[in-house]
Amino acid sequence: MNDIILKSLSTLITEQRNPNSVDIDRQSTLEIVRLMNEEDKLVPLAIESCLPQISLAVEQIVQAFQQGGRLIYIGAGTSGRLGVLDASECPPTFGVSTEMVKGIIAGGECAIRHPVEGAEDNTKAVLNDLQSIHFSKNDVLVGIAASGRTPYVIAGLQYAKSLGALTISIASNPKSEMAEIADIAIETIVGPEILTGSSRLKSGTAQKMVLNMLTTASMILLGKCYENLMVDVQASNEKLKARAVRIVMQATDCNKTLAEQTLLEADQNAKLAIMMILSTLSKSEAKVLLERHQGKLRNALSK
Protein backbone atom coordinates (compact mmCIF):
# COMPACT_ATOMS: atom_id res chain seq x y z
CA MET A 1 0.00 0.00 0.00
CA ASN A 2 2.85 2.40 0.86
CA ASP A 3 4.37 1.82 -2.57
CA ILE A 4 1.06 2.70 -4.21
CA ILE A 5 0.75 5.91 -2.20
CA LEU A 6 4.39 6.77 -2.88
CA LYS A 7 3.85 6.35 -6.61
CA SER A 8 0.64 8.40 -6.47
CA LEU A 9 2.31 11.26 -4.61
CA SER A 10 5.24 11.32 -7.01
CA THR A 11 2.92 12.37 -9.84
CA LEU A 12 1.39 15.33 -7.99
CA ILE A 13 2.55 18.86 -8.81
CA THR A 14 2.12 19.83 -5.16
CA GLU A 15 4.66 17.14 -4.19
CA GLN A 16 7.35 18.19 -6.67
CA ARG A 17 10.49 20.06 -5.64
CA ASN A 18 10.51 23.75 -6.53
CA PRO A 19 13.73 24.56 -8.43
CA ASN A 20 13.55 28.15 -7.19
CA SER A 21 13.90 27.13 -3.55
CA VAL A 22 16.46 24.30 -3.63
CA ASP A 23 18.99 26.49 -1.79
CA ILE A 24 16.47 28.16 0.53
CA ASP A 25 18.28 26.82 3.61
CA ARG A 26 21.32 28.88 2.61
CA GLN A 27 19.48 32.13 1.99
CA SER A 28 19.21 35.22 4.17
CA THR A 29 15.98 36.12 5.93
CA LEU A 30 15.21 38.79 3.35
CA GLU A 31 15.91 36.39 0.48
CA ILE A 32 13.58 33.78 2.00
CA VAL A 33 10.63 36.12 2.45
CA ARG A 34 11.25 37.70 -0.95
CA LEU A 35 11.14 34.25 -2.57
CA MET A 36 7.93 33.43 -0.71
CA ASN A 37 6.40 36.67 -1.92
CA GLU A 38 7.41 35.96 -5.51
CA GLU A 39 5.90 32.48 -5.35
CA ASP A 40 2.70 33.83 -3.80
CA LYS A 41 2.26 36.11 -6.82
CA LEU A 42 1.47 32.96 -8.82
CA VAL A 43 -1.68 32.31 -6.77
CA PRO A 44 -4.02 34.98 -8.22
CA LEU A 45 -2.83 34.06 -11.71
CA ALA A 46 -3.79 30.43 -11.08
CA ILE A 47 -7.19 31.49 -9.77
CA GLU A 48 -7.77 33.73 -12.78
CA SER A 49 -7.83 30.67 -15.02
CA CYS A 50 -10.51 29.14 -12.76
CA LEU A 51 -12.92 32.09 -12.77
CA PRO A 52 -15.45 30.47 -15.15
CA GLN A 53 -15.72 27.43 -12.87
CA ILE A 54 -15.87 29.58 -9.73
CA SER A 55 -18.60 31.74 -11.28
CA LEU A 56 -20.63 28.66 -12.20
CA ALA A 57 -20.20 27.31 -8.68
CA VAL A 58 -21.45 30.58 -7.18
CA GLU A 59 -24.55 30.56 -9.36
CA GLN A 60 -25.35 26.99 -8.34
CA ILE A 61 -24.76 27.77 -4.66
CA VAL A 62 -27.11 30.76 -4.83
CA GLN A 63 -29.77 28.60 -6.44
CA ALA A 64 -29.39 26.06 -3.64
CA PHE A 65 -29.66 28.79 -0.99
CA GLN A 66 -32.83 30.12 -2.60
CA GLN A 67 -34.34 26.65 -2.40
CA GLY A 68 -33.47 26.22 1.26
CA GLY A 69 -30.22 24.33 0.78
CA ARG A 70 -26.91 24.82 2.56
CA LEU A 71 -23.25 25.13 1.61
CA ILE A 72 -21.08 22.50 3.29
CA TYR A 73 -17.27 22.39 3.18
CA ILE A 74 -15.28 19.25 3.94
CA GLY A 75 -11.53 18.85 4.18
CA ALA A 76 -8.65 17.51 6.25
CA GLY A 77 -5.85 19.46 7.91
CA THR A 78 -5.29 22.93 6.47
CA SER A 79 -8.06 22.44 3.91
CA GLY A 80 -10.59 21.55 6.60
CA ARG A 81 -9.53 24.45 8.81
CA LEU A 82 -9.96 26.92 5.97
CA GLY A 83 -13.47 25.62 5.35
CA VAL A 84 -14.35 26.03 9.03
CA LEU A 85 -12.84 29.53 9.01
CA ASP A 86 -14.79 30.71 5.98
CA ALA A 87 -18.06 29.24 7.26
CA SER A 88 -17.64 30.83 10.69
CA GLU A 89 -17.26 34.30 9.17
CA CYS A 90 -20.60 34.21 7.34
CA PRO A 91 -23.01 34.80 10.27
CA PRO A 92 -21.37 38.00 11.60
CA THR A 93 -20.58 39.36 8.14
CA PHE A 94 -23.84 38.62 6.37
CA GLY A 95 -26.33 38.07 9.18
CA VAL A 96 -27.11 34.48 8.14
CA SER A 97 -27.80 31.41 10.24
CA THR A 98 -24.85 29.32 11.43
CA GLU A 99 -26.53 26.44 9.59
CA MET A 100 -26.40 28.10 6.16
CA VAL A 101 -22.67 27.58 5.62
CA LYS A 102 -20.88 24.88 7.60
CA GLY A 103 -17.32 23.61 7.66
CA ILE A 104 -16.54 20.00 8.54
CA ILE A 105 -12.96 18.94 9.26
CA ALA A 106 -11.72 15.35 9.31
CA GLY A 107 -11.14 14.36 12.92
CA GLY A 108 -13.77 16.70 14.34
CA GLU A 109 -13.46 19.84 16.45
CA CYS A 110 -10.18 18.70 18.00
CA ALA A 111 -8.57 18.68 14.53
CA ILE A 112 -9.06 22.43 14.19
CA ARG A 113 -6.19 22.98 16.65
CA HIS A 114 -4.36 19.65 16.73
CA PRO A 115 -3.43 17.04 14.11
CA VAL A 116 -5.55 13.88 14.37
CA GLU A 117 -3.71 10.79 13.22
CA GLY A 118 -5.39 8.93 10.36
CA ALA A 119 -8.31 11.35 10.12
CA GLU A 120 -7.86 12.11 6.42
CA ASP A 121 -7.92 8.38 5.59
CA ASN A 122 -11.13 7.64 7.51
CA THR A 123 -13.75 7.23 4.80
CA LYS A 124 -16.43 6.03 7.22
CA ALA A 125 -16.11 9.09 9.43
CA VAL A 126 -17.12 11.50 6.68
CA LEU A 127 -20.36 9.60 6.13
CA ASN A 128 -21.15 9.91 9.83
CA ASP A 129 -20.18 13.59 9.76
CA LEU A 130 -22.48 14.36 6.84
CA GLN A 131 -25.34 12.27 8.15
CA SER A 132 -25.07 13.96 11.56
CA ILE A 133 -25.94 17.31 9.95
CA HIS A 134 -28.67 15.68 7.86
CA PHE A 135 -26.92 16.43 4.56
CA SER A 136 -29.40 16.14 1.69
CA LYS A 137 -29.71 16.52 -2.07
CA ASN A 138 -30.74 20.14 -1.52
CA ASP A 139 -27.31 21.01 -0.13
CA VAL A 140 -24.04 21.75 -1.94
CA LEU A 141 -20.87 19.92 -0.91
CA VAL A 142 -17.46 21.49 -1.54
CA GLY A 143 -14.55 19.08 -1.14
CA ILE A 144 -11.23 20.80 -0.44
CA ALA A 145 -7.84 19.08 -0.77
CA ALA A 146 -4.67 20.39 -2.39
CA SER A 147 -3.71 16.90 -3.53
CA GLY A 148 -7.13 16.12 -4.95
CA ARG A 149 -6.84 12.59 -3.55
CA THR A 150 -7.69 12.79 0.18
CA PRO A 151 -9.79 9.67 0.99
CA TYR A 152 -12.02 11.49 3.52
CA VAL A 153 -12.95 14.12 0.95
CA ILE A 154 -13.37 11.68 -1.93
CA ALA A 155 -15.75 9.54 0.13
CA GLY A 156 -17.73 12.63 1.08
CA LEU A 157 -18.08 13.73 -2.53
CA GLN A 158 -19.17 10.24 -3.55
CA TYR A 159 -21.80 10.17 -0.81
CA ALA A 160 -23.16 13.59 -1.77
CA LYS A 161 -23.22 12.53 -5.41
CA SER A 162 -25.22 9.40 -4.52
CA LEU A 163 -27.88 11.63 -2.94
CA GLY A 164 -28.11 13.82 -6.03
CA ALA A 165 -26.51 16.86 -4.37
CA LEU A 166 -24.30 19.29 -6.29
CA THR A 167 -20.61 18.59 -5.69
CA ILE A 168 -17.67 20.96 -6.12
CA SER A 169 -13.97 20.15 -5.76
CA ILE A 170 -11.08 22.50 -5.03
CA ALA A 171 -7.62 21.04 -5.69
CA SER A 172 -4.18 22.23 -6.75
CA ASN A 173 -3.42 19.31 -9.04
CA PRO A 174 -4.92 18.83 -12.52
CA LYS A 175 -7.27 15.97 -13.38
CA SER A 176 -7.47 14.79 -9.79
CA GLU A 177 -9.60 11.97 -8.40
CA MET A 178 -11.82 14.59 -6.78
CA ALA A 179 -12.28 16.41 -10.09
CA GLU A 180 -13.49 13.21 -11.72
CA ILE A 181 -16.27 12.93 -9.14
CA ALA A 182 -17.31 16.56 -8.75
CA ASP A 183 -19.90 18.32 -10.90
CA ILE A 184 -17.71 21.42 -10.89
CA ALA A 185 -13.93 21.08 -10.57
CA ILE A 186 -11.93 24.14 -9.51
CA GLU A 187 -8.24 23.44 -10.12
CA THR A 188 -5.88 26.09 -8.76
CA ILE A 189 -2.56 24.99 -10.24
CA VAL A 190 -0.11 27.07 -8.23
CA GLY A 191 2.92 24.84 -8.82
CA PRO A 192 5.37 23.27 -6.36
CA GLU A 193 5.68 24.80 -2.90
CA ILE A 194 8.91 26.40 -1.66
CA LEU A 195 8.94 23.66 0.99
CA THR A 196 8.26 20.46 -0.90
CA GLY A 197 4.78 19.15 -0.18
CA SER A 198 3.83 21.90 2.28
CA SER A 199 0.47 22.64 0.70
CA ARG A 200 -0.51 25.00 3.54
CA LEU A 201 1.46 27.61 1.57
CA LYS A 202 0.43 28.53 -2.01
CA SER A 203 -2.22 25.85 -2.23
CA GLY A 204 -3.75 26.93 1.07
CA THR A 205 -3.70 30.57 0.00
CA ALA A 206 -5.45 29.63 -3.24
CA GLN A 207 -8.09 27.67 -1.33
CA LYS A 208 -8.80 30.62 0.96
CA MET A 209 -9.16 32.97 -2.01
CA VAL A 210 -11.60 30.61 -3.74
CA LEU A 211 -13.67 30.17 -0.58
CA ASN A 212 -13.77 33.96 -0.19
CA MET A 213 -15.23 34.18 -3.69
CA LEU A 214 -17.78 31.39 -3.21
CA THR A 215 -19.37 32.86 -0.09
CA THR A 216 -18.90 36.58 -0.76
CA ALA A 217 -20.19 36.49 -4.34
CA SER A 218 -23.10 34.27 -3.28
CA MET A 219 -24.09 36.62 -0.49
CA ILE A 220 -23.85 39.65 -2.78
CA LEU A 221 -26.21 37.97 -5.24
CA LEU A 222 -28.59 37.19 -2.37
CA GLY A 223 -28.78 40.90 -1.53
CA LYS A 224 -26.58 40.82 1.56
CA CYS A 225 -24.89 44.06 0.56
CA TYR A 226 -25.97 47.48 -0.73
CA GLU A 227 -23.45 49.12 -3.03
CA ASN A 228 -20.32 47.70 -1.36
CA LEU A 229 -21.62 47.99 2.20
CA MET A 230 -22.27 45.01 4.51
CA VAL A 231 -25.83 46.01 5.34
CA ASP A 232 -26.66 42.67 7.00
CA VAL A 233 -23.74 42.84 9.42
CA GLN A 234 -24.64 41.61 12.92
CA ALA A 235 -23.75 44.32 15.43
CA SER A 236 -22.67 41.86 18.12
CA ASN A 237 -19.82 43.89 19.64
CA GLU A 238 -18.80 47.52 20.03
CA LYS A 239 -16.71 47.56 16.85
CA LEU A 240 -19.54 46.12 14.77
CA LYS A 241 -22.06 48.49 16.36
CA ALA A 242 -19.86 51.39 15.30
CA ARG A 243 -19.53 49.86 11.84
CA ALA A 244 -23.32 49.61 11.55
CA VAL A 245 -23.60 53.33 12.32
CA ARG A 246 -20.98 54.12 9.68
CA ILE A 247 -22.75 51.89 7.14
CA VAL A 248 -26.05 53.70 7.65
CA MET A 249 -24.33 57.08 7.41
CA GLN A 250 -22.46 56.12 4.24
CA ALA A 251 -25.52 54.61 2.55
CA THR A 252 -27.85 57.51 3.32
CA ASP A 253 -25.49 60.47 3.75
CA CYS A 254 -27.17 61.16 7.08
CA ASN A 255 -25.56 62.39 10.29
CA LYS A 256 -24.47 60.21 13.21
CA THR A 257 -27.43 61.14 15.39
CA LEU A 258 -30.03 60.10 12.81
CA ALA A 259 -28.13 56.90 12.04
CA GLU A 260 -28.02 55.90 15.71
CA GLN A 261 -31.66 56.81 16.32
CA THR A 262 -32.89 54.88 13.29
CA LEU A 263 -30.72 51.87 14.12
CA LEU A 264 -32.22 51.83 17.60
CA GLU A 265 -35.71 51.92 16.12
CA ALA A 266 -34.75 49.22 13.61
CA ASP A 267 -33.38 46.90 16.33
CA GLN A 268 -29.80 47.47 15.11
CA ASN A 269 -30.71 46.19 11.64
CA ALA A 270 -28.60 48.37 9.32
CA LYS A 271 -30.45 47.32 6.18
CA LEU A 272 -33.82 48.16 7.67
CA ALA A 273 -32.52 51.48 9.01
CA ILE A 274 -31.22 52.44 5.57
CA MET A 275 -34.54 51.50 3.99
CA MET A 276 -36.42 53.62 6.52
CA ILE A 277 -34.24 56.68 5.97
CA LEU A 278 -34.06 56.55 2.17
CA SER A 279 -37.73 55.66 1.65
CA THR A 280 -39.11 57.70 4.59
CA LEU A 281 -41.30 54.69 5.39
CA SER A 282 -42.13 53.49 8.87
CA LYS A 283 -40.33 50.48 10.32
CA SER A 284 -43.21 48.11 9.54
CA GLU A 285 -43.71 49.49 6.02
CA ALA A 286 -40.00 49.30 5.23
CA LYS A 287 -39.84 45.75 6.57
CA VAL A 288 -42.75 44.61 4.38
CA LEU A 289 -41.19 46.14 1.27
CA LEU A 290 -37.84 44.49 1.97
CA GLU A 291 -39.50 41.12 2.46
CA ARG A 292 -41.39 41.58 -0.80
CA HIS A 293 -38.03 41.93 -2.55
CA GLN A 294 -36.34 39.00 -0.78
CA GLY A 295 -34.24 41.33 1.34
CA LYS A 296 -32.58 43.02 -1.64
CA LEU A 297 -32.29 46.64 -0.60
CA ARG A 298 -31.50 48.08 -4.02
CA ASN A 299 -34.53 46.39 -5.58
CA ALA A 300 -36.80 47.53 -2.75
CA LEU A 301 -35.62 51.13 -3.07
CA SER A 302 -36.22 51.17 -6.82
CA LYS A 303 -39.94 50.52 -6.35
Swiss-Prot record:
Assembly behavior: Homodimer.
Reaction(s) catalysed by this chain's protein: N-acetyl-D-muramate 6-phosphate + H2O = N-acetyl-D-glucosamine 6-phosphate + (R)-lactate
NCBIfam families: N-acetylmuramic acid 6-phosphate etherase (TIGR00274), PRK05441.1 (NF003915), PRK12570.1 (NF009222)
Family (UniProt): Belongs to the GCKR-like family. MurNAc-6-P etherase subfamily.
Top enzyme category: lyase
Main function: Specifically catalyzes the cleavage of the D-lactyl ether substituent of MurNAc 6-phosphate, producing GlcNAc 6-phosphate and D-lactate. Together with AnmK, is also required for the utilization of anhydro-N-acetylmuramic acid (anhMurNAc) either imported from the medium or derived from its own cell wall murein, and thus plays a role in cell wall recycling.
Catalytic residues identified in the record: E89, E120
Domain of life according to the entry: Bacteria
Gene that encodes the chain: murQ
Native source species: Haemophilus influenzae (strain ATCC 51907 / DSM 11121 / KW20 / Rd)
Pfam families documented for this protein: GKRP-like_C, GKRP_SIS_N
Name this polypeptide is given: N-acetylmuramic acid 6-phosphate etherase
InterPro entries: Etherase_MurQ (IPR005488), Glucokinase_regulatory_CS (IPR005486), MURQ/GCKR (IPR040190), SIS_dom (IPR001347), SIS_dom_sf (IPR046348)
Pathway assigned in UniProt: Amino-sugar metabolism; 1,6-anhydro-N-acetylmuramate degradation; Amino-sugar metabolism; N-acetylmuramate degradation; Cell wall biogenesis; peptidoglycan recycling
GO biological process, one term: N-acetylmuramic acid catabolic process
EC numbers: 4.2.1.126
Residues covered by the SIS domain: 61-224
